Regions:
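Terminal, regulation- and interaction-focused segments at domain boundaries
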Residues: 1-32
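A generic structural signal for beta-strand entry/edge sites
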Residues: 3, 40-42, 58-60
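C-terminal structural segments of small proteins and small subunits
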Residues: 5-7, 60-92
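Intrinsically disordered, low-complexity acidic/polar segments
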Residues: 15, 54, 72-74
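Short linear functional motifs in flexible/disordered or boundary regions
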Residues: 20, 29, 33-36, 66, ...
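Ser/Thr-rich, low-complexity intrinsically disordered terminal regions
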Residues: 27-53
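Beta-strand residues in well-ordered beta-sheet regions across diverse protein folds
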Residues: 46, 55, 64-66
Length: 92
């Protein structure tokens, strides 16, 4: 099993940062069929082969995920796409 751990700084107010994470989750649900739910300031997400979360904190967020065997082959492209979306939504 492979894992992803990405930390990203941001300067958005909490409500705006949470809204941006929600928009990303909505897009992932639509595009890849992920299921997600909020627990406090943590968005948990799951899909066949992927289990992860986005922890939202003041001035930063952290994306962690465990990839199943088949998804591990795509770790590089998945990380690159996560970083691209974070830069787009939260500045880089």
């Amino acid at each position: 099993m492979s894992s992803i751990d990405i930390r990203h700084a941001h300067s958005l107010p909490h409500a705006q940062a949470r809204k941006a994470v929600q928009e990303v989750a909505d897009k992932l649900a639509e595009r890849f069929g992920i299921d997600y739910d909020w627990q406090g300031d943590t968005l948990n997400f799951t899909r066949s082969g992927v289990d992860g979360k986005i922890d939202l904190a003041p001035q930063s967020l952290r994306v962690t995920a465990s990839l199943g065997f088949l998804m591990s082959a795509f770790k590089g492209p998945i990380e690159a796409e996560i970083k691209r979306v974070l830069d787009e939504r939260f500045g880089g």
